[in-house]
A protein has these predicted regions:
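Conserved, structured core segments of small domains
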Residues: 1-89
Length: 89
């Protein structure tokens, strides 16, 4: 299955909203881990975004999946970028 990098960009204005929805966001990510979709995720050191490594059938299916993140549903993500990642090349 292809591997994708999913990058979120946040704005400082959404910080409190992200705090409010963080528990649901993390539960959603844990479910992706349980389903073996999410391989790795970590926020950026400056808290301006997050990078995640995921498996998916194609770019569109990954974009559709991440549209259901509680952060996305609450409009707390400034930008989502999904790109296929070819490891080891």
């Amino acid at each position: 299955m292809p591997i994708f990098v999913v990058e979120y960009a946040y704005t400082p204005e959404t910080s409190s909203g992200r705090d409010d929805h963080r528990t649901d966001h993390r539960a959603w990510l844990r479910e992706l881990e349980r389903r073996k979709i999410l391989r790795s995720s970590s926020p950026l050191a400056d808290h301006s975004g997050t990078t995640m490594i995921v498996e998916g059938a194609d770019k569109l299916s990954v974009e559709r999946l991440f549209a259901h993140d509680p952060f996305a549903l609450a409009h707390l993500i400034e930008r989502v970028h999904v790109e296929e990642w070819v490891a080891g090349t």
